[in-house]
């Protein structure tokens, strides 16, 4: 993990292809490249980051689902989603690895019964989300639903504005400091 930006890299020159890192990665993001005979992973478009350009996945995402910024920038969207609204969670917080990636729970429509009517049951089971993101999931889902209800009733919601991302340029704040991704 690089100190200057938090990006985790696999040293291709030192890798012997034993695949221990593939097995050890708690996030299951390292894979074995059979052509080069080394383990590898996403490098977060490091050459782009070094030029101050957003990673390709974030820049090209049609749903504007990826935000890139600094966790300590109180004016930025990452800080607000993680600290102010507390709706962005790390994957597997029980590992206590200080991840650079945070997730906002998906708000899916309810399940439908056999007759096609909506039920009170979520399409993605809450228990499954808890297994991925920890015990705060129900609290996060309640916050998201309350903010969505505010917006539906015509009230303003900074949280919904952040998640809708009308101005996608505000989703990217890059530079030489540590960055977090959502």
Task: Report residues per predicted region.
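Ferredoxin-like iron-sulfur electron-transfer modules
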Residues: 1-59, 71-73
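Long, compositionally biased charged/polar accessory segments in the mid-to-C-terminal portions
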Residues: 56-182
